[in-house]
Structures are given as C-alpha cells and as structure tokens.
C-alpha cells in the first residue's frame, strides 16, 4: 500500500482497543467542508470497538479534551545493560534502518536528503535510565532498556515514522560489539496544545546553539554571556521559512533559564557544549507550539532540543 498525502485542514484517526496496528492514510469521502483523509489501521473495520478521534492541526478531541498526538514513544529492549556512549548516533542508525526498509525505502530521502544540509521537521531525544554512568565507549545503564521520543509537527512525517518503526518491531539490531536490541513497543504520546504565551519546560535532550562562521562551528551554553541572543538568533533562523511567522513573533520570543546548566554532549567525533535543565519560554503560543513539535535550537534532527512542558 502507498501512503497518500493529506491536503486539507483536518483528518481522522481510528484507534483499535485490542492491539496496536499500522497506520495508513487512505482517501475517503466524508461529509465535511473539504475533502478529507482517514488514518486507519489495515483491518480496523473488522473490530466493533474501534474508536474515532477527530484530529486537526490543533490536535485530537478525546473525551472532550483537546490533545495533540504528534510524538512517538519507542521502547528498545537490549541484550545487555549497556548502550553506546554516542547514543544519538546509535538511534540515528536505527532510524535509518527503519526508513530504508519501510516501503522499500521510498521515503528515506525525505528524512535524510542528499546534498546541502537543510532544516528537518522532526527531532528526537534518547532517554537513558536514571543513574546511568558513562564507562568510556558505553553507558552502564543498570537496566536493559531505553526509551526514545520522536517528535514532529508534520502529520505525514508522523505517520511515516510511526509505520517505519512499527515494521521494525521485534527485529534484532546491533548497536555495538556484544550489545544488540529490538524495538519492543511503538506508541503515540499526547500533550495538550500550547495556549499560553509562557511555558515552563524541561529539556529531554540538550539545547544545542551553534554559530557557523568561516567554516568553523562555535557552540554556546547557558554559561556564555550572549547565550540569550544566540538562542533567539537560532530560533529566528529555524523558523524563517514558516510563512506565518512575523517579525513581531520573533522579536517577542524569550528564554529564561530556570534550573539549567552547561553539559557536554558527544556526537560522532565532536564534543558539543550545550545546555540542559529547565527554562521558561515566552512568546506567541503558535511559535512555542512549533518549537515543541519540531525542537528548538541547532541539530534537532540529530537528537537535540526536545523538551517536555511542565506547566502552561
């Protein structure tokens, strides 16, 4: 089956109460103002207890409460209580495997295009168990599992990523010498939409702020005196292609570290100076929602800039 692309404002999603199933986009004629698509599992019509949740750009209406379903929780079971120290690279490898095998890899280039680097509409965070300790080339986890969170504001990307990782469930993947693992579960995660102009957030993956000058990269942590201006510069750059963003929105954005400190993140051969902890983000709700959906800062698609909302 091929995935059809959504072209209207709203779409629908069936949820199955009995088991997780793959989500497909299929065209369907329904009574509404514009042609719509339906997201449904392959054999959802076989079950009577399927529930219908209406989705829109703002989210899903479930039992009278508006929710967004644009994040995916991926649980990975490991053969050993270890994981590579460069765990962002390890998860990227897993993601590439998922996309290269799903639908014969026809959507791989959408997520990993060749040529000049470009901004991507997704981000992820890899969560190691509390108490994990770095032992050189690997982390001692204390448990034989990790949980990764994928987020995107692009509904099509969400469906493709969900389906790709679902297809990978149960298949062994080699992460490092002596350590393999498998995707144990793939589940959607919901969050109320941002409705206020001030939110307290906790970063699930480090906030990376990069400045590229004369073919050299410089990274800014919260300890740098111009950290605030650098964050605003990067946010302006990452949102510049959004036609609904105004200069006033960008000028009104602010970040106020709450309990945030400097951290050094390993990524391939680099040691990147970043920031981790909690902060208050201020700005137009739609702008804050965009940052929540696709990450904030530099290198979001490489495992940086994902946050959870603590209070709105």
Map each language-model feature to its residues.
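Intrinsic-disorder-associated, low-complexity terminal segments enriched in Asp/Asn/His/Tyr and depleted
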Residues: 11, 16, 24, 28, ...
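Short, Lys/Arg-enriched N-terminal segments with co-localized hydrophobic residues
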Residues: 44, 48-69
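RNA-interacting cores
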Residues: 24, 37-40, 61-312
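Short, small-residue-biased leader/transition segments that mark boundaries at the very start
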Residues: 1-4
């Amino acid at each position: 089956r091929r995935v059809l692309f959504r072209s209207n404002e709203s779409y629908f999603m069936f949820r199955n109460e009995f088991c997780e199933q793959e989500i497909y986009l299929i065209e369907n004629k329904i009574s509404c103002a514009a042609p719509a698509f339906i997201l449904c599992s392959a054999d959802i019509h076989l079950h009577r207890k399927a529930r219908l949740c209406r989705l829109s750009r703002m989210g899903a209406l479930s039992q009278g409460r508006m929710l967004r379903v644009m994040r995916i929780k991926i649980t990975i079971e490991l053969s050993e209580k270890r994981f590579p120290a460069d765990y962002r690279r390890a998860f990227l490898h897993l993601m590439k495997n998922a996309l290269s095998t799903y639908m014969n890899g026809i959507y791989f280039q959408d997520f990993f295009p060749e040529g000049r680097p470009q901004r991507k509409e997704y981000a992820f965070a890899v969560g190691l168990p509390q108490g994990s300790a770095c032992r050189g080339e690997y982390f001692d986890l204390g448990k034989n599992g990790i949980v990764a969170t994928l987020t995107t504001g692009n509904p099509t990307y969400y469906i493709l990523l969900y389906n790709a990782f679902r297809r990978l469930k149960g298949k062994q993947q080699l992460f490092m010498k002596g350590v393999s693992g498998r995707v144990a579960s793939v589940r959607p995660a919901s969050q109320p939409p941002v409705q206020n102009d001030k939110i307290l957030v906790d970063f699930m993956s480090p906030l990376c702020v990069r400045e590229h000058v004369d073919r050299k990269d410089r990274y800014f942590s919260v300890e740098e005196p111009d950290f605030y201006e650098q964050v605003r510069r990067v946010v302006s750059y990452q949102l510049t292609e959004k036609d609904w963003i105004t200069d006033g929105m960008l000028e009104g954005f602010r970040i106020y570290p709450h309990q945030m400190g400097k951290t050094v993140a390993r990524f391939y051969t680099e040691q990147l100076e970043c920031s981790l902890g909690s902060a208050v983000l201020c700005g137009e709700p739609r702008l804050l929602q965009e940052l929540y959906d696709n990450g904030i800062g530099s290198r979001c698609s490489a495992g940086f800039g994902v946050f959870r909302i603590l209070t709105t």
